[in-house]
């Protein structure tokens, strides 16, 4: 049975953290609105047999998951390191993002396959409540654009949320247009065509997340710092007393934390302390936040 302390750690503390910050409260409010309307779209989509509306609800599901992960990660990443998690728990966001991205790519692919089947064999769609629900989804996304328009210009995290909502808005526009074409023109093919459009938006929006999170988990040298690191290595080799660089390893622990380990061979008459200081400055200038240096003297 879960203890009260465990319940507080898992749920109450993150909630208090979210409510204590204005930006987090804004994200949480939009998450609640988005989640509620996502359920409405799923129910209406299944009742009306509209694959386009179900696809839009899946896109909203992705955004809800991304918002929830971001909120929880903002709390858990601030927890101090301990004997079990020596680096802290910053990779929670990376791992969750990877799982989320894989799931959405699979969902997008399945929707495309189902859409192709419906293009070949169009099915009747009930438009009685479809237009109202699809317009409502568009209005929810417009509210999101207004919510995050300011953060779009000031913060990378806010910009990411804004772009997710913008893609959602485009998907909602597609659903509204397809609904109008079905209602007034009888073009049943508009629904699966809209679904394919939304699926492409879903996959296109998650591919960068999938690639980035996979590269972090595989400990790839971070793309954003590659040129700076090359320049830093050249400057390290020019440092007085440095003979060579051995066993260089650079990787990202999180999206923003770059880690490096370095084994330097220096001349026997060089000042190791001064060499470490100069090399540390060069690594810091290259964007490395945590590094381990091993300096070994060799005879000239």
Swiss-Prot record:
Top-level lineage group: Eukaryota
**Record InterPro entries:** Cation_efflux, Cation_efflux_TMD_sf, Msc2-like
Membrane topology term: Multi-pass membrane protein
Q: Which SUPFAM superfamilies match?
A: Cation efflux protein transmembrane domain-like
Example GO biological process term?
A: zinc ion import across plasma membrane
Keyword terms of this UniProt record: Ion transport, Membrane, Transmembrane, Transmembrane helix, Transport, Vacuole
- Which sequence ranges are listed under topological domain Cytoplasmic? 1-26, 72-91, 150-160, 208-300
Q: Name one GO molecular function term.
A: metal ion transmembrane transporter activity
Q: Which family does it belong to?
A: Belongs to the cation diffusion facilitator (CDF) transporter (TC 2.A.4) family. SLC30A subfamily.
Its biological purpose is as follows: Involved in sequestration of excess metal in the cytoplasm into vacuoles to maintain metal homeostasis.
Q: What is this protein called?
A: Metal tolerance protein 12
């Amino acid at each position: 049975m879960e203890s009260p302390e465990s319940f507080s750690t898992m749920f109450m503390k993150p909630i208090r953290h979210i409510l204590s910050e204005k930006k987090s409260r804004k994200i949480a409010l939009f998450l609640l609105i988005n989640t509620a309307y996502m359920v409405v779209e799923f129910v209406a989509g299944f009742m009306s047999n509209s694959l386009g509306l179900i696809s839009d609800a899946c896109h909203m599901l992705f955004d809800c998951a991304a918002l929830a992960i971001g909120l929880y990660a903002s709390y858990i990443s601030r927890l101090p390191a301990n004997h079990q998690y020596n680096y802290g728990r910053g990779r929670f966001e990376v791992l969750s993002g990877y799982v989320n991205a894989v799931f959405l790519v699979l969902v997008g692919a399945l929707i495309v396959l189902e859409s192709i089947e419906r293009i070949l064999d169009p099915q009747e769609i009930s438009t009685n409540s479809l237009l109202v629900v699809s317009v409502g989804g568009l209005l929810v996304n417009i509210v999101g654009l207004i919510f995050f328009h300011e953060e779009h210009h000031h913060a990378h995290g806010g910009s990411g949320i804004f772009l997710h909502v913008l893609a959602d808005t485009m998907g909602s526009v597609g659903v509204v247009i397809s609904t109008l074409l079905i209602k007034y023109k009888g073009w049943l093919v508009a629904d699966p065509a809209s679904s394919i459009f939304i699926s492409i938006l879903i996959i296109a929006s998650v591919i960068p997340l999938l690639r980035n999170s996979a590269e972090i988990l595989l400990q790839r040298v971070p793309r954003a710092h590659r040129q700076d690191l090359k320049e830093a290595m050249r400057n390290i080799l020019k440092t007085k007393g440095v003979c060579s660089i051995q066993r260089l390893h650079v990787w990202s622990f999180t999206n923003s934390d770059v880690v490096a380990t370095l084994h330097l061979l220096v001349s026997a008459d060089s000042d190791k302390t001064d060499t470490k200081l100069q090399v540390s400055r060069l690594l810091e200038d290259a964007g490395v936040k945590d590094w381990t240096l091993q300096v070994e003297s060799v005879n000239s």
